[in-house]
Amino acid sequence: VLSGSDKTNVKGVFAKIGGHAEDYGAETLERMFITYPQTKTYFPHFDLQHGSAQIKGHGKKVVGALIEAANHIDDIAASLSKLSDLHAQKLRVDPVNFKLLGQCFLVVVAIHHPSVLTPEVHASLDKFLCAVGNVLTAKYR
């Protein structure tokens, strides 16, 4: 459960990164594909080379969904309901991949905003990413 300070911390992080959705999203995906190559199996039709338009486009969607969840932090489930349906019923993404993506996103935030990512903010962002992952996997049950 996200506390009031967690919510404030998360909103503060996303206020800093909102204008960089495409870049940070692409970097997150590239990092995930390199670190966890098994995640590439969900993107057989993508050009997975650094800087590809497909990676940038999907990265922008990923970070856009995180921004949407942060903007509706009191009801993440409602804000990501359609995305949850898509990933569970159509794409059938292995739920562990949401955790892997979250870890890579944390690294990207740390690289670009080291002074923002204090231990407290890191913990809040991690809790938020876990909450997002839980919402995205809720319809698997």
Curated annotation (Swiss-Prot):
InterPro entries: Globin, Globin-like_sf, Globin/Proto, Hemoglobin_a-typ, Hemoglobin_oxygen_transport, Hemoglobin_pi. O2 binds at H58. GO terms for biological process: hydrogen peroxide catabolic process. Keywords: Heme, Iron, Metal-binding, Oxygen transport, Transport. The gene is HBAA. Involved in oxygen transport from the lung to the various peripheral tissues. This is Hemoglobin subunit alpha-A. It comes from the Eukaryota. It holds the Pfam family Globin. Red blood cells. GO terms for cellular component: blood microparticle; haptoglobin-hemoglobin complex; hemoglobin complex. The lineage of its organism: Eukaryota, Metazoa, Chordata, Craniata, Vertebrata. It comes from Vultur gryphus.
